[in-house]
Amino acid sequence: MSYLNADHPNGMSYGDGYLQGAGSLGQVVKIVGDDLFAVNIDSAAKSFGLLIKDYASGDMPGIYCGGGIYTTDVFTGSIAAGDALMAGVDGKLTKQTGTNPQIATAISVSGGTLKFKLLI
């Protein structure tokens, strides 16, 4: 089972909108309309935060945002400490490529666990 621990969170949003389409714990979301969020599968799009659990389409999601330190096993690709992270094509954290917006910085990766600083 996947996890996302808020080790030192700065903010959480709940009750600020609804989810368009389903989303899973740890996926990156973006704003797609008034009070409407969706999983961000476009690496170039501006991200808003991370889902705190699994949600169905139409649910009012909890979203970690506003920075903080987190640990998770929800990420893709090879990441090293110090890497800039972005939203990947699957909506998960991945190593930043090109000029895509950075949303987090990797602090450590060990045993399938990523510790990172959220910048959004």
Annotate each language-model stretch with its function.
Residues 1-120:
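Surface-exposed, low-hydrophobicity beta-strand/loop segments enriched in small/polar/acidic residues
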